[in-house]
Amino acid sequence: MPHRKKILLSDSNEAFSMLLTDSLRERGDFRVFHARDADETTEVLHRHRPHVLLLDFLLPHKGGFHVMQHLREDRYKISTIFMTALPTHKVIEEAYRLGASFVL
């Protein structure tokens, strides 16, 4: 049996997270983890070593950029899709500078 791809969804919006998690599970053989803030995201990253990170810009307390900076400092290699409802040029540019694979 092939290994399932592991995805970490880091978003504080519970309804959105449940909808996206269900959608991912229906469309593929994915194992989806969920984190609600930057600290929980970092903890899940180190515990489960996911292949993909779906990361919200507006996480409580420290925010998505804090997580990306942590990944960069630790030289943690992961495909990161940075999600934002505030797609300003500055936010998009900073996300890519910190290592985002894609910005939504």
Question: At which residue positions do the language-model features occur?
Answer:
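Acidic, metal-coordinating helix/loop segments flanking the phosphotransfer/catalytic sites
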Residues: 34-52
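Short amphipathic alpha-helix used as the core "switch/output" element in two-component signaling
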Residues: 43, 65-76
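Two-component/phosphorelay signaling modules centered on CheY-like receiver
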Residues: 14-33
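Acidic catalytic/metal-coordinating carboxylates
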Residues: 37, 63-66
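Alpha4 helix (beta4-alpha4-beta5 surface) of REC/receiver domains from two-component response regulators
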Residues: 66, 87-104
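Non-catalytic signal-transmission and effector/linker regions of two-component phosphorelay proteins
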Residues: 1-8, 12, 16-18
